[in-house]
Amino acid sequence: MGPKKKKISGNGQSQKLNKQIHITPVRPGLNDHLPFVSICTPTFNRRPFWEMAIKCFDEYDYPKDRMEWIIVDDGTDKVEDLVSHIPQVKYHKYDEQMMLGKKRNLMHAKTRGDIIIYQDDDDYYPPDRVSHAVQTLTANPTALCAGSSIVFVYFKHITQMYRFGPYGPNHATAGTFAFRRELLRQTRYDDNKAIGEERDFLKGYTIPFVQLDPMKTILVFPHIHNSCDKRELLVYAPNPTCNPDPDINVNTILRNESIYQFFMKDIDDILQNYPPGDPKYKVEVNKQVAVVKEANTKRMEEHRKKKQEEAQRADTNKIVDDANKRVQEERGKAIRVMVQNKKLLIKLREYEKLLGIEPEHAFTEEHVV
């Protein structure tokens, strides 16, 4: 049976859906020794992204019989029809629009996995996303959480890949998280947080942590329906944690042709014709975004001012150092002249004696210094 088409609610365009079977045929019990994994995805009016998200899930190389996919949907354009055919999916829909922190806590309560791994609905995740995270946590038994403090972000408007991070050994953005169930006995998200929720969950980045390979974890494509316009991150670039990376291109991480087509060519027109995804409908989220933006702007302005003052001090110090250097050079020259003059004075006195010149007519140091 060929792929079916489904209308995109709100824009009248059609979108092909991935209807293949998400079951890996294996002998019963063959993979029981592997940790059971709960994939968690919160979503709000992101219908255009779900074909891509499903393909990412389908391409994971971790055994599907050791996975479940928890989806919490509080959007007005529910995606139940797009995911209900997937055996691993546990879909939960809510009419109440929630903050991201509350949605993540709610997802956790629905999971049964030994390891919980995040898959955001609008980012690309490589096939080894799950297996790499599981292997890394297994190899680091003291770590409760894994993630990547380095994230690659491709900005189409300037055709440039940027490397963000690293920010610290215990830091990562939530979209890269993978953690043991044990962690949920120690922490939870702030229900009222919609942005920057990671800091609370990781207790100020003090949770025992291990870093993941960013190339095996996530690739981010900014788009017009982001709650925060990621292009604004470039205002103060380059800086120590935000730099272009000419050695990494999209194909280095993303090798699925149809997903590449979606992100590189199709996405802009699709989102322009999908009004439900407009960030203006996230009223409470936007309030928090505005507060964070203001704080970030103030912080970056203080950083800029500090750098400017440091540069001015450096310039002043250089001027003083150069002046001191010139003074020392001139002093050295003067001393050398004085030494030479004294030598000449001694010679002159010797000649004076030979010539019988009277002392009152002789040269003195005052004549030559």
Task: Go through each PLM region and give its residues.
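Conserved donor NDP-sugar-binding/catalytic core segment of glycosyltransferases
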Residues: D128-M161
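N-proximal low-complexity "stem/linker" segments adjacent to membrane-targeting elements
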Residues: M1-D58, E330
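Glycine-rich, basic loop-to-helix element that forms the pyrophosphate-binding segment
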Residues: Y94-T111
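Acidic donor-binding segment of Leloir-type glycosyltransferases
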Residues: I54-K93
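Cell-envelope/extracellular polymer assembly enzymes that use nucleotide-activated donors
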Residues: P35-S38, E68, D200
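Conserved nucleotide-sugar donor-binding catalytic segment
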Residues: Y167-Y260
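The conserved acidic donor/metal-binding loop of glycosyltransferases
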Residues: D120-Y125
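Short aromatic/hydrophobic "clamp" motif used to bind/position activated sugar donors
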Residues: I116
